[in-house]
Amino acid sequence: LCNSGVRWLSKAPPNKTLEEMWRQLDEGAELFSDLWNADVPCLAIENPVMHKYAKERIRNYQHFAQSVQPWEFAKDEAGPDNVKKRTCFWTRNLPNLTKTGTLDGSTARDEIHKAAPSKDRWKIRSKFYPALAAAMADQWGRAASITRQELTC
């Protein structure tokens, strides 16, 4: 679904066919659609920036509510969160995250974009960051709890 993978839709990677790549896109879009259209009061879906082929396959697609960078939640220049990796959130009945970090982004590492090709590159690029995860749990956990109370009253 993400921009970084769109190139595989015109030239498949080794050991894959274009048909397989388009089928995987359809499966990913179907999963996103099922989550996005779920009948739940509060919802957050995380994904990188999407390409146009994904957007046109997602039922009731809407633009993401917010995009953030891990460094916006970092407090230590040498810490694991001081990196550049744009992450988008599609949300329902949840507020945008408030940035909790103290850094300005000028020292943020771009190790994700510069990761050398390797068998583990996918793991490096899939990493999620602890300060961002903590902000999600804290801020959205409180908001979802309040929403749940309002819906049951």
Which stretches of residues belong to each language-model region?
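Conserved active-site and SAM-binding loop architecture
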Residues: L1-C153
